[in-house]
């Protein structure tokens, strides 16, 4: 459908919504003078030239629409034309909210079913593999909404399916307004879920797979209570009053990608934020997730940034923090990967009078503006789903309402005000104003009225209005309120265009390092004060590795520091191996050793890395008596080796040349265990059991039992290594950016960390951005 022009309000009924700086049709009509009272022949002769021009115009319009409806090329569809219509007055629905009875479900087989967490999807084809994975998410009920194209025998165990016939029996008012062949029939599903106890609704797509199969891991599913995080959230700055919309993909590392619904005039704004502010969590009632693979992009991007047979596989930074939108700044919101809390359920309504690919985007902007009336906000989350690009035709024509109107809509919404005193009246007021302005038609005004009445009928309680912050003087943002975060600039290597000029060498190196170590877990034991260093270590190494697990002799829940004993550190590692079972390997390092990760790229991640080639780290000791420490440890090694299975025992004895008189000791400040040997490592830990075997003895024993030293990767053999002395003090002359690692290096404060980063910047210049 084409977007309708704004209808003129009746002279007897002035508009009830207040719109700033937007001309009305009454003002437009006053520009024209009254027609003269002429007889037809005189009028015809005086206006012959005008009639000819007008006739030509009519023929042109008819020809254009004929071509428009018979041509499927993107170039023609870029041009938009709105049909000229007679101005018609709109009537605002009058609803008696207190007279709407609550109507429980008495007809469906699920009349007595109640649950709080729902996943609502529209289905046109038989169940996809992605949809089957959604059904497996624990604690969430999948609700599949059919349309006229859905197979009659559609079925998926674990889901609830509502066919067209089943939908019709529910008796909702919105059914009179919904098309039969569109995904916007999801509105029926939202009402059904609310009627059956929904408190959270995940608006999903049947080709999207939730990453790790856990919505609670990615979204803030709980906003109140013991399970809620109640933490400050990074927020875009509101300091620039001229900025009304942002591209969230920049925040998550993809500055050359833009979401469907972003005004095309804003596509070129690719600079990251100078600074952010913070907002307290708990009112992010609409949570927009980012999708890896095929993110929500518009047809302009889809057609111009890829070849026909190339599938998109775009990745975003999973480590970027979630980010909130302040009042006055908007963001595109879709129906593919979005979590709605009950306070925003009214905002799930999908408009029916606009093109299908514009429906959820218009809903998102409409909903954001109304959310401000409740003191709520939208937050955007790091990758929560993976959508697969099936290389299907992407209909530009279905987005025509976006490219023509979305920029104007945002300006309109920021200027719009309402004087209504209840929230549902305010919702209806905005829908009326949007119909007046031609963003949708009177059909959606009536649909809004039906939707709001259905919400009450299924038991939904309308929220209470709060004062709008937009009309208050904005507080100045002080230096202490500024929060810095520099997004990664991930190169879009998948794109059909070259981006050589936009991605610096440093960024390219970072991507290369991240690609190499992105599935390696770094385990760090902190001997120093974690209160002063834990966050810094995560900042330094978290850019490179899959995750950074920090251990210390004392637990610190606030900093996510786990308790472990260094003497028996190997006994703690199996827990971490199990937690990150998909990791490619595990790199252990103590905080007195610096990793120059750029020099580890050549190492084989399928082999053991250790310091067996570093003479001061890996030594053989001959015990001198029965009671000294080395003798005790040697006896424990003999006891362990005697219980080893044949393959371990043979490896160990071959490596030590069956010499029972010496004990292999390794300082073990840094070592790497590949995934293929994780099971062997765990088996050896189990063999040690409760014995008091020190890690400097256990780790080399494990490695010699697991594989031949000839197979160890020699990458750490060239590290800078000096033994600590009682008067040890870090010296800048010790550090070398050309070595794979440096030991020792003392870090006990933020200032020590800054000094280290300044040294490491020789190998990784981007580190200077951290200080």
UniProtKB/Swiss-Prot annotation:
Region (Disordered): 1-23
Cytoplasmic side of membrane: 1-50
Keyword Cytoplasm tagged: no
Keyword terms, alphabetized: Glycoprotein, Glycosyltransferase, Golgi apparatus, Membrane, Signal-anchor, Transferase, Transmembrane, Transmembrane helix
InterPro entries in alphabetical order: STL-like
Residues passing through the membrane, by range: 51-71
Deletion phenotype: No visible phenotype, due to the redundancy with STL2. Stl1 and stl2 double mutants are impaired in cellulose production and exhibit a stunted growth.
Tissue distribution: Expressed in cells that are expanding or producing secondary cell walls.
GO MF terms, alphabetically ordered: glycosyltransferase activity; identical protein binding
Quaternary state and interactors: Homo- and heterodimer with STL2. Interacts with CESA1, CESA3, CESA4, CESA6, CESA7 and CESA8, but not with GOT1.
Additional remarks: In classical Greek, STELLO mean 'to set in order, arrange, send'.
Designated name of the protein: Probable glycosyltransferase STELLO1
Gene name as annotated: STL1
């Amino acid at each position: 459908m084409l977007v309708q022009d704004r209808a003129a309000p009746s002279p007897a009924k002035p508009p009830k919504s207040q719109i700033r700086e937007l001309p009305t049709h009454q003002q437009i009509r006053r520009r024209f003078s009254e027609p003269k009272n002429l007889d037809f022949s005189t009028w015809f002769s005086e206006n012959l030239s005008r009639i000819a021009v007008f006739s030509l115009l009519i023929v042109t319009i008819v020809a254009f629409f004929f071509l428009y409806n018979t041509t499927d090329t993107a170039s023609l569809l870029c041009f938009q034309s709105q049909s000229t219509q007679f101005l018609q007055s709109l009537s605002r629905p009058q609803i008696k909210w207190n007279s709407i009875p609550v109507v429980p479900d008495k007809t469906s087989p699920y009349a007595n079913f109640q649950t709080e967490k729902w996943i609502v999807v529209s289905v046109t084809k038989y169940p996809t593999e992605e949809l089957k994975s959604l059904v497996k998410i624990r604690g969430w009920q999948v609700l599949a909404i059919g349309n006229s194209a859905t197979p009659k025998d559609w079925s998926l165990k674990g889901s609830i399916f509502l066919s067209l016939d089943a939908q019709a029996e529910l008796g909702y008012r919105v059914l009179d307004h919904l098309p039969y062949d569109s995904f916007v029939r999801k509105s029926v599903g939202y009402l059904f879920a609310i009627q059956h106890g929904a408190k959270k609704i995940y608006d999903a797509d049947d080709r999207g797979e939730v990453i790790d199969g856990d919505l609670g891991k990615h979204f803030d599913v709980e906003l109140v209570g013991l399970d809620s995080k109640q933490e400050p959230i990074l927020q875009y700055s509101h300091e620039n009053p001229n900025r009304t919309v942002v591209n969230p993909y920049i925040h998550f590392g993809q500055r050359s990608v833009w979401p469907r619904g972003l005004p095309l005039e804003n596509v070129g704004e690719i600079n990251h934020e100078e600074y952010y502010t913070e907002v307290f969590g708990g009112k992010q009632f609409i949570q927009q997730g980012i999708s890896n693979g095929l993110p929500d992009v518009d047809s302009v991007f889809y057609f111009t940034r890829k070849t026909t047979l190339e599938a998109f596989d775009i990745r975003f930074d999973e480590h970027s923090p979630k980010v909130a939108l302040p009042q006055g700044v908007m963001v595109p919101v879709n129906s593919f990967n979005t979590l709605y809390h009950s306070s925003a359920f009214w905002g799930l309504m999908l408009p029916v009078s606009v093109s299908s690919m514009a429906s959820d985007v218009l809903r998102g902007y409409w909903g954001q503006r109304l959310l401000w009336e409740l003191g709520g906000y939208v937050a955007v989350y790091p990758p929560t789903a993976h959508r697969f690009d099936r290389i299907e035709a992407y209909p530009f024509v279905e987005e025509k309402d976006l490219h023509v109107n979305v920029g104007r809509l945002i300006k309109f919404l920021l200027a719009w005000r309402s004087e209504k005193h209840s929230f549902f009246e305010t919702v209806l007021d905005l829908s009326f104003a949007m119909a007046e302005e031609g963003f949708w038609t009177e059909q959606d005004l009536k649909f809004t009225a039906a939707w709001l009445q259905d919400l009450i009928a299924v038991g939904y309680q309308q929220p209470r209005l709060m004062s709008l912050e937009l009309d208050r003087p904005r507080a100045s943002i002080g230096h202490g309120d500024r929060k810095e975060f520099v997004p990664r600039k991930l190169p879009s290597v998948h794109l059909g265009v070259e981006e050589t000029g936009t991605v610096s060498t440093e960024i390219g190196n970072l991507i290369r390092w991240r690609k190499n170590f992105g599935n390696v877990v770094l385990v760090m034991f902190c001997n120093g004060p974690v209160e002063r260093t834990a966050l810094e270590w995560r900042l330094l190494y978290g850019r490179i590795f899959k995750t950074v697990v920090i251990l210390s002799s004392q637990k610190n829940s606030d900093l996510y520091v786990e308790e472990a004993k260094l003497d028996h550190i190997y006994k703690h590692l199996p827990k971490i191996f199990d937690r990150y079972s998909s990791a490619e390997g595990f790199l252990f390092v103590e905080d007195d050793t610096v990793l120059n990760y750029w020099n580890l790229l050549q190492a084989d991640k399928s082999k053991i890395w250790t310091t067996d080639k570093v003479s001061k780290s890996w030594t053989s000791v001959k015990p001198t008596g029965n009671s000294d420490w080395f003798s005790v440890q040697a006896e424990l090694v003999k006891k362990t080796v005697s219980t080893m299975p044949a393959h371990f025992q043979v490896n160990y004895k071959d490596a030590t040349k069956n010499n029972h008189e010496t004990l292999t000791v390794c300082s073990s400040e840094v070592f790497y265990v590949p995934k293929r040997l994780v099971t062997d490592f765990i088996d050896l830990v189990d063999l040690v059991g409760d014995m008091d075997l020190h890690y400097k003895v256990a780790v080399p024993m494990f490695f010699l039992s697991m594989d031949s030293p000839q197979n160890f990767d020699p990458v750490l053999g060239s590290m800078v290594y000096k033994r600590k002395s009682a008067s040890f003090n870090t010296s800048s002359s010790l550090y070398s950016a050309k070595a794979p690692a440096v030991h020792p290096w003392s870090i006990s404060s933020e200032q020590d960390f800054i000094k280290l980063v300044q040294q490491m910047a020789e190998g990784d210049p981007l580190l200077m951005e951290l200080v």
